[in-house]
Amino acid sequence: MLIQVWHHTLYSYDQVVLLGIHKLYLIPQYRPYFRIEHQKFQINPKTEGENFRQDLAGNWYKQCWFTQKTDHLEITGEWIFKLQSFNPFGFILDKSFEESGWSNPMFQFSYEERTAFLIPFLQEKEETYFMDFLTQVRKESSGLVDFIVRLTRMIYQEWKHEIRHEENIWDSTYTFEQKKGSCRDLALMEMDMLREIGLATRFVSGYAFNPDLEDGHELHAWLEVFLPGAGWVGVDPSLGLFTDQSYIPLASHPDPKRTLPVQGSYIGSATSQLVTRVDVKLLHK
């Protein structure tokens, strides 16, 4: 299957400004199920310099800097991806990990090696805000994978999905109480739910091709949970499913703010306005 992605971002300033160093998280992160057949990238105004860099989480991004003043920053990316289908459930879970958490009276999972690397992906403080809800889902589930499937489907069915163009993400407890949220809000809420039972999770932003998604979802957000034996497994509460070849990640991080496509600053007293658009088209099945 071939798909084309066109991503346009425009920051407009009501006065001229001097742009600071920018990080553009608009580099598709490697996955074995897709191949980039074509790519084109344009930045206006012209950069003084740019280079590919990699952050602590392993994400590649484009760092760029400017010397001329401007009243706008325009970024356009175009890609053609060849996608190879795969089974998102094609893994064998570490049974000892599953059984130790599933049989735990407190419903808590624990990784055999709780290394420093895992800490950012786990819950920072002991809270049980979602535990009553999670316990109910557990009663209806036959194991850990089935639990995650049911939880993801329940969020999809019981929380209203909204399109919000603001860059902020609602607090998980607020999203839970409001019974609604954007793809980013729902992803963070499920992240925090899974962290509450000891699972490591990270936030993912990227492109999603799915006819069932409403307009505005092409620049999408989902989460990944680390399951021993399976590794990082993608989950999308906006559609109630495990992610497949239709998901192309741009960045993943335990902190959602670190996955914003454009990160940078400017010098000046101007106010800015953001307009962004993403088009995803099927070229060939």
Functional labels for PLM-detected ranges:
Residues 100-102, 108-181, 189, 213, ...:
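Secondary-structure boundary elements
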Residues 25-27, 42-44, 78, 224, ...:
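Residues in well-ordered beta-strands of folded domains
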Residues 14-25, 162-172, 220-224:
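Short N-terminal helix-initiation segments at or just after the protein's N-terminus
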Residues 3-4, 24-29, 97, 152-158, ...:
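Short acidic/polar alpha-helix capping motifs at helix-coil junctions
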Residues 8, 12, 133, 171-175, ...:
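Short, hydrophobic/aromatic alpha-helical segments in well-folded domains
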Residues 1-102:
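Intrinsically disordered, low-complexity N-terminal segments that are enriched in acidic
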Residues 153, 185-272:
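Hydrophobic/aromatic-rich core segments of domains that either
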